[in-house]
């Protein structure tokens, strides 16, 4: 007999919210049928309108809060409910940190099937000030009714929600956006129409080096000719402190990829300089660099602590990117081998090592699951392996190769608790056990959490 679904689309229901979903949405039940309600807080009774019904769950839109949680707070941003950038501004920051810790723990239990009774689970490392933390912002520029618009995409759409002030990006980026809006209005600059492929300005990228204060502005254009660019350069260079370079990136392809291949430096330098800890990095428009440098330093310090290096160890750094973790590890390691599939990232890693005077690192282009077994075949035995994979997690074959190499310590840095938990479940079957788990809030006001895990070989 087919299960009767107790809710109907477009009807309103009173729902008690007894849990949080993956990105912080409220979860309640009607006759044991699950309903997700965005912006509802655990412990609240709400009225929600059902906007979507599936076989096993429904999605409701928050209409009214009948019983309010003491964990609720007023969002600071006027476009919070329209813009897709933040998910948790309505939740007190202490509760955001608790939510993120619980999210990690639930994944470890449910997906990893791990016994956590002897595992140390630390509180989420948060920020003293959880606003204005992003050192990079990318804003689409579109056109509506003949007028250019700058903002963020509405969640799950390409509709641009105009923004004057974003509370999670560095405040100097907000100042630059207002100047660009002034320039667009004054000189009637065309925004890009993604349907017709016409228009001048496609995207604005702003990068700021927090330690040095240097700022880079990138104008992504559909055409090589940018009318009145001299006026914009004058406005930016006279009104923005710390501006180091203004770059034009030309992208005339019909694509969702933001940056094109060709760049022209319109004013100043093509890179900015920043530090993580003691290490200096040159950052171009295309460089990968963690967007929250304050929390990155805490994350990498935890990785170094978990690695427990004494100066005698060989370390493998899988998915090493531009070598930022490798550099941190090199301080206390005998040798660090970094592997990364993106050739440009490896070139950056080599430059970063050279300019910091580091000689005990070696960087290899290739898939970690292919290159690390080759290193092991050459007789290079790691005492410590660090993995920092993309959201999809580690390849199963890589985990098996690591286990066969039998390092005493594995340090796993993850941006997705679900794939982390899956991989930890595999490692637990290969002779390893989880010792300690440290969630880090890299992205306050959002549902995302970074996690670093200390894993030890079980010596029988």
Swiss-Prot record:
Entry EC number(s): 2.1.1.-
GO annotation, biological process: rRNA base methylation
Enzyme class, first EC level, given as a word: transferase
Superkingdom of origin: Bacteria
Pfam families associated with the record: TRAM, tRNA_U5-meth_tr
Segment forming the signal sequence: none
Residues the entry annotates as binding [4Fe-4S] cluster: 77, 83, 86, 166
Active site: 415 (nucleophile)
Domain TRAM: 6-64
Keyword vocabulary terms for this entry: 4Fe-4S, Iron, Iron-sulfur, Metal-binding, Methyltransferase, S-adenosyl-L-methionine, Transferase
Entry's Gene Ontology molecular function annotations: 4 iron, 4 sulfur cluster binding; metal ion binding; rRNA (uridine-C5-)-methyltransferase activity
Residues holding S-adenosyl-L-methionine: 290, 319, 340, 388
Gene3D superfamilies with a match to the protein in the record: 2.40.50.1070, Nucleic acid-binding proteins, Vaccinia Virus protein VP39
InterPro entries in alphabetical order: MeTrfase_TrmA_AS, MeTrfase_TrmA_CS, NA-bd_OB-fold, SAM-dependent_MTases_sf, TRAM_dom, U5_MeTrfase_fam
SUPFAM superfamilies in UniProt: Nucleic acid-binding proteins, S-adenosyl-L-methionine-dependent methyltransferases
Similarity comment: Belongs to the class I-like SAM-binding methyltransferase superfamily. RNA M5U methyltransferase family.
Protein name: Uncharacterized RNA methyltransferase CA_C0523
Protein source organism: Clostridium acetobutylicum (strain ATCC 824 / DSM 792 / JCM 1419 / IAM 19013 / LMG 5710 / NBRC 13948 / NRRL B-527 / VKM B-1787 / 2291 / W)
């Amino acid at each position: 007999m087919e299960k009767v679904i107790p809710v109907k689309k477009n009807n309103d229901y009173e729902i008690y919210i007894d849990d949080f979903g993956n990105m912080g949405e409220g979860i309640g039940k009607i006759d044991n049928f699950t309903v997700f309600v965005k912006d509802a807080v655990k412990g609240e009774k709400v009225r929600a309108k059902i906007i979507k019904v599936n076989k096993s769950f429904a999605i409701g839109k928050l209409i009214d809060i009948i019983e309010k949680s003491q964990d609720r707070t007023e969002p600071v941003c006027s476009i919070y409910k329209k813009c897709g950038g933040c998910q948790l501004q309505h939740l007190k920051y202490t509760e955001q940190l608790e939510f993120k810790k619980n999210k990690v723990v639930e994944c470890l239990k449910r997906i990893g099937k791990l016994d956590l009774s002897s595992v140390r689970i630390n509180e989420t490392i948060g920020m003293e000030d959880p606003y204005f933390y992003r050192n990079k912002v990318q804003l689409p520029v579109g056109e509506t009714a003949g007028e250019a618009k700058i903002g963020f995409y509405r969640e799950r759409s390409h509709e641009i929600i105009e923004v004057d002030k974003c509370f999670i990006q560095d405040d100097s980026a907000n100042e630059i956006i207002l100047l660009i809006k002034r320039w667009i209005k004054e000189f009637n600059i065309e925004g890009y129409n993604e349907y017709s492929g016409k228009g001048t300005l496609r995207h604005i990228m702003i990068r700021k080096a927090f330690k040095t204060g240097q700022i880079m502005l990138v104008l992504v254009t559909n055409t090589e000719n940018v009318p009145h660019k001299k006026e914009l350069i004058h406005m930016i260079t006279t009104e923005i402190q710390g501006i180091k370079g203004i770059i034009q990136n030309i992208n005339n392809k019909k694509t969702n990829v933001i940056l094109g291949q060709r760049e022209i430096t319109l004013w100043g330098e093509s890179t900015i300089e920043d530090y993580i800890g003691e290490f200096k990095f040159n950052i171009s428009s295309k460089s990968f660099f963690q967007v929250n440098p304050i929390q990155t330093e805490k994350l990498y310090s935890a990785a170094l602590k978990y690695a427990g290096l004494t100066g005698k160890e060989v370390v493998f750094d899988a998915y090493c990117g531009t070598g930022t973790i490798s550099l941190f590890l090199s301080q206390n390691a005998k040798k660090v081998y970094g592997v990364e599939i993106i050739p440009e990232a490896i070139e950056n890693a080599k430059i970063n090592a050279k300019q910091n005077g580091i000689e005990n690192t070696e960087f290899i282009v290739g898939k970690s699951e292919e290159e690390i077994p080759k290193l092991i075949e050459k007789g290079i035995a790691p005492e410590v392996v660090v993995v920092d994979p993309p959201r999809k997690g580690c390849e199963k074959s890589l985990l098996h190769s690591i286990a066969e190499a039998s390092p005493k310590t594995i340090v796993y840095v993850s941006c997705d608790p679900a794939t982390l938990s899956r991989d930890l479940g595999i490692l637990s079957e290969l002779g390893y056990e989880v010792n300690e788990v440290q969630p880090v809030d890299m992205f306050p006001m959002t549902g995302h959490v970074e996690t670093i895990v200390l894993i030890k070989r079980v010596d029988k």
